[in-house]
Regions:
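N-terminal carbohydrate-binding/catalytic regions of secreted carbohydrate-active enzymes
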Residues: 1-56, 62
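Aromatic-lined, polymer-binding surfaces characteristic
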Residues: 35-181
Length: 181
């Protein structure tokens, strides 16, 4: 259950958040919202640790940010948020990721943007294999499965954030073809 910090009431995780109608692709319950907030907060903290570590020359922060980025990429590897060509049909799905990773212009946008920035700040501290893990299982997968659409059809958020996220991810992946996308 979740306790609201404002009204102090306790809510079951499956309670409809009431933000979007059930027919909206962003519709979700309170559990979805809390998990999405976790992803957004974690990736933001990774960027902050990496940036502060660089600015202050603090290897502890750089090491921790690298560790978290690699852990995140490893977890993303086995996380089926959309049916994909690479996923076995019998692979279990986690109910929350159906709506969390449809937040194209909100949650994913921020998550991918932060992952790409963190990767840029930490790339030189990783082995070739570690870089490949982050590139393939975190950045490229979110980009392919969630962000790429031929036409932006949503009115929930600003299109510039969608574009800047694709460009940031393209820079992290060193893909000039995506910058001109």
């Amino acid at each position: 259950s979740f306790r609201c910090g404002t009204c102090k009431q306790t809510f079951a995780p499956e309670v409809d958040s009431g933000v979007y109608t059930p027919s909206d692709c962003y519709h979700g319950d309170l559990y979805d919202g809390w998990v999405c907030l976790f992803h957004i907060t974690l990736t933001q903290r990774m960027v902050e640790m990496a940036l502060l570590g660089r600015m202050e020359g603090d290897s502890r922060l750089l090491d921790r940010a690298t560790e978290l980025l690699l852990l995140y990429a490893e977890r993303m590897r086995s996380m089926p948020w959309r049916p994909g060509k690479d996923l076995s049909p019998d692979m279990p799905t986690f109910r929350q990721y159906g709506s969390i990773f449809t937040y194209h212009r909100e949650g994913d946008n921020k998550i991918l943007f932060d992952l790409a920035q963190t990767f840029e700040l930490l790339r030189d501290r990783m082995t070739v294999e570690q870089r490949a893990t982050v590139e393939v299982h975190a950045i490229q997968r979110l980009l392919d499965d969630v962000m790429f659409e031929p036409v932006y059809l949503y009115d929930h958020n600003n299109v510039y954030q969608w574009h800047r996220t694709i460009v940031q991810a393209a820079l992290a992946l060193e893909r000039e073809d995506l910058v001109d996308w």
